[in-house]
Amino acid sequence: MRKFAYCKVVLATSLIWVLLDMFLLLYFSECNKCDEKKERGLPAGDVLEPVQKPHEGPGEMGKPVVIPKEDQEKMKEMFKINQFNLMASEMIALNRSLPDVRLEGCKTKVYPDNLPTTSVVIVFHNEAWSTLLRTVHSVINRSPRHMIEEIVLVDDASERDFLKRPLESYVKKLKVPVHVIRMEQRSGLIRARLKGAAVSKGQVITFLDAHCECTVGWLEPLLARIKHDRRTVVCPIIDVISDDTFEYMAGSDMTYGGFNWKLNFRWYPVPQREMDRRKGDRTLPVRTPTMAGGLFSIDRDYFQEIGTYDAGMDIWGGENLEISFRIWQCGGTLEIVTCSHVGHVFRKATPYTFPGGTGQIINKNNRRLAEVWMDEFKNFFYIISPGVTKVDYGDISSRVGLRHKLQCKPFSWYLENIYPDSQIPRHYFSLGEIRNVETNQCLDNMARKENEKVGIFNCHGMGGNQVFSYTANKEIRTDDLCLDVSKLNGPVTMLKCHHLKGNQLWEYDPVKLTLQHVNSNQCLDKATEEDSQVPSIRDCNGSRSQQWLLRNVTLPEIF
């Protein structure tokens, strides 16, 4: 009997433990599901920890999000709110996993322990909750904790309620100090960044846009370069986050920043001279003439010494070239650190409006940078964009004084030493219209792109698309495109200038007024009846239709 009672006790105890195990298993399974929902939702109280292994949810490891057919119409409506696929963004975890897109040589680099601390300044205006918080979480989760002094979120007068108290409540619970600073009125990126920089405390200031994702190892190589030389300003490689699917695509380490005649920032291939300077080691930083401006790190004291941003500029536009010129001309160095990768949502259109329109604002900002930093080379810009000369660009005396105080070099030095492959030719025979003697029409790039035919149109004398440079290298150039003929009788197309002469070599005879294409031995001619909007190229015959006047454009009110 005693033995039977003992067996019953053992069985009962075992049954209790089995039931308890089943309960715990079910409980934690449900908790995991709840956590997953919290990660993907809107405001949540829990702090999201770094992802240790790839999840299987939408967008994990940077994969594209596919929206079901039945949700396509709703997706299109939501797209208009921020000019990116908001539905896709809200499906993705705030701490999603990303691939390690660094070069193999970058993954084994070792950095000093005593790197400077940084304050990360992020300006936002009516930003989506998911993209803003994904930016914040990527900074926290993929940065050594002791290197992040704080994150400063600068609200440029947002109107959306969830960016008010809910945002403040959320960031208070994060394991890195996050401060929300409010601009009293819509001030624009430039002044909002200045506000964020002024309240920040880190030894380095890192500026990011509000729709970024930092990848593993992004911060250390940036801070290491600044520790090596505090006058070095550094940018990560900017990877592309699709505005349509939020797919994460690695950017190239073989491009760097430049600009065209209209002072638009452009990406161009890293020249061979820069590859030679680095002895072919692609893990070494690239010296870049300009930066895109959205993402960079700079020593706090150096930022003050070189004049921060030009506070006379409005909203955004041109500030990236202005600070790029200033860094180089005033003794600093600007680099793209190829071992640092940060993703950025590139939008095809801006969702924001500005008083007076973006064109007027950018014209004012570009006029200020041209007047202060470009010396006589501002002529190129004004001839291409004559409307700029009519804008009120304010008082620039303090910025001119800054240039003198810092003993900055002339813009010609910048072109010769930092950007010798600039689209601005330093030596040329003419800059202006190329007019046909018989028809009185002018060559016109028609705002066409590379590989398209050059046009011809009635001369309007307003510069812009009818400005061509006949360079000392005997190229006929419009911005970074050169007139190119690859076969007899044309067509005459616009291709990237390669400086190798060949199909882009033209001989102008100032007596006969002919433009002879050297390779084909044919002459530029007026348009044909078959195509009245493009010039032709034919055997030279001395006719008036093959005579061209190369006229320099001047703007007496400026020069």
Swiss-Prot record:
Lumenal topology ranges: 29-559
Domain characteristics, as noted in the entry: There are two conserved domains in the glycosyltransferase region: the N-terminal domain (domain A, also called GT1 motif), which is probably involved in manganese coordination and substrate binding and the C-terminal domain (domain B, also called Gal/GalNAc-T motif), which is probably involved in catalytic reaction and UDP-Gal binding.
Residues in Ricin B-type lectin domain copies: 429-551
Alphabetized Gene3D superfamilies for the sequence: 2.80.10.50, Spore Coat Polysaccharide Biosynthesis Protein SpsA, Chain A
Glycan attachment points: N95, N552
Keywords for the protein's UniProt record, in alphabetical order: Disulfide bond, Glycoprotein, Glycosyltransferase, Golgi apparatus, Lectin, Manganese, Membrane, Metal-binding, Secreted, Signal-anchor, Transferase, Transmembrane, Transmembrane helix
Span list, region Catalytic subdomain A: 115-225
TM ranges: 9-28
GO cellular component terms attached to this protein's record: endoplasmic reticulum membrane; endoplasmic reticulum-Golgi intermediate compartment membrane; extracellular region; Golgi cisterna membrane; Golgi membrane; membrane; perinuclear region of cytoplasm
InterPro entries, per database record: GalNAc-T, Glyco_trans_2-like, Nucleotide-diphossugar_trans, Ricin_B-like_lectins, Ricin_B_lectin
Catalysed reactions, semicolon-separated: L-seryl-[protein] + UDP-N-acetyl-alpha-D-galactosamine = a 3-O-[N-acetyl-alpha-D-galactosaminyl]-L-seryl-[protein] + UDP + H(+); L-threonyl-[protein] + UDP-N-acetyl-alpha-D-galactosamine = a 3-O-[N-acetyl-alpha-D-galactosaminyl]-L-threonyl-[protein] + UDP + H(+)
Family: Belongs to the glycosyltransferase 2 family. GalNAc-T subfamily.
Protein's UniProt keywords contain Plastid: no
Methyltransferase recorded as keyword: no
Residues annotated to bind Mn(2+): D209, H211, H344
Binding site for substrate: D156, R186, W316, R347, Y352
Disulfide bonds: C106-C339, C330-C408, C442-C459, C482-C497, C523-C540
EC number: 2.4.1.41
Name the record gives this protein: Polypeptide N-acetylgalactosaminyltransferase 1
Organism: Homo sapiens (Human)
Tissue: Widely expressed. Expressed in all tissues tested.
Taxonomic lineage: Eukaryota, Metazoa, Chordata, Craniata, Vertebrata
Cofactor: Mn(2+)
GO BP terms, alphabetized: O-glycan processing; protein O-linked glycosylation; protein O-linked glycosylation via serine; protein O-linked glycosylation via threonine; viral protein processing
